Each structure stands twice: as C-alpha cells, then as structure tokens.
C-alpha cells in the first residue's frame, strides 16, 4: 500500500474528560503500603562513571597489606627471612598495577577488534602473545 502524506487537521474539541472509575484509582496507589522501589541506574551508567573516576585517580587500587603478603609469599620461594623496605613494596605495587592497567587496555583493544565489549581470557592471551611475553 502506498504511503500518503498526512496533513494537519484542526481539532474540533473532542470528548470531555471522564471521571476516574474506582478500580482505576485503586490501581494507581501502590498496594504494598507505600514502599518505594529503590532507584536504579540504567545498565552501563555506573560502569562508565567508575571508568571516569578511576582514569582520573592516581591512588593504588590494590590494598597494601594483601599485596605485601603476596610479595612476601612469593619471595619465600627464593630466600627465607627476606626483609623489605616499605618503599620497595610500594614500588613493586606501582609497577604491578601499571603493568596490569596496560595489559587490560591491550586486552580491551583485542576484544573490540573481535567486535565484542566483554573481555575474555583469549583476549589476555592474545595481548600477551602480541607483546612477546608468551609464545
């Protein structure tokens, strides 16, 4: 059927508004006794806000004590009773976080290249292989 162009027509009044029926009025009030639903942002809004927040910030994202325990645990395999200066642990943490951020940036690019927005283990493997870290 062919499309026809619609022209504006002048309104000639229309019907008067009717009174609400009792059933409609009862339906509009919440039946749960006025319990308000908690506000939820649309999917992705909070994620984008977090991305902007963490891109602006420079503080360390991994907690200091768990990272320190991990460093000491790994160092135990090489030599027992090793001591660390506090600045040494902070330097290791800075380097580790910088490495991880770079790896996740490359991983995200791999996912985007595959026309996806979700990163997968195969993206991390590809990013490391391209970097020459893993054959």
Curated annotation (Swiss-Prot):
SMART domains found in the cross-reference section: H3 (SM00428)
Subcellular location: Nucleus; Chromosome
Region (Disordered): 1-40
Residue positions where N6-acetyllysine is found in the record: 10, 15, 19, 24, 28
Recorded GO MF terms: DNA binding; protein heterodimerization activity; structural constituent of chromatin
Keywords, sorted A to Z: Acetylation, Chromosome, DNA-binding, Methylation, Nucleosome core, Nucleus, Phosphoprotein
GO CC, any one term: nucleosome
Chief location of this protein within or outside the cell: nucleus
Entries under PROSITE patterns matching the protein: HISTONE_H3_1, HISTONE_H3_2
Residue positions, PTM Phosphoserine: 11
Site entry: Not N6-acetylated: 5, 36-37
Top-rank lineage group of the source organism: Eukaryota
Positions bearing Phosphothreonine: 12
PTM section of the record: Acetylation is generally linked to gene activation. Acetylated to form H3K9ac (11%), H3K14ac (17%), H3K18ac (11%), H3K23ac (16%) and H3K27ac (7%). H3K4, H3K35 and H3K36 are not acetylated. H3K4me prevents acetylation. 32% of the histone H3 are acetylated with, on average, 2.4 acetyl-Lys. They are all continuously deacatylated and re-acetylated with a half-life of approximately 2 minutes. Monomethylated to form H3K4me1 (81%), H3K9me1 (16%), H3K27me1 (25%), H3K35me1 (25%) and H3K36me1 (5%). No methylation at H3K14, H3K18 and H3K23. Methylated by a protein complex that includes Mut11. Set1 methylates specifically H3K4. H3K4me1 is associated with silenced euchromatin. Set3 forms H3K9me1, while H3K9me2 is undetected. H3K9me1 is specifically associated with silent, multi-copy transgenes.
Site positions (Not N6-methylated): 15, 19, 24
Gene3D superfamilies, per the entry: Histone, subunit A
Family: Belongs to the histone H3 family.
Function: Core component of nucleosome. Nucleosomes wrap and compact DNA into chromatin, limiting DNA accessibility to the cellular machineries which require DNA as a template. Histones thereby play a central role in transcription regulation, DNA repair, DNA replication and chromosomal stability. DNA accessibility is regulated via a complex set of post-translational modifications of histones, also called histone code, and nucleosome remodeling.
Subunit structure: The nucleosome is a histone octamer containing two molecules each of H2A, H2B, H3 and H4 assembled in one H3-H4 heterotetramer and two H2A-H2B heterodimers. The octamer wraps approximately 147 bp of DNA.
The protein's name in its UniProt record: Histone H3 type 3
Higher taxonomy: Eukaryota, Viridiplantae, Chlorophyta, core chlorophytes, Chlorophyceae
Name of the coding gene: ch3-IV
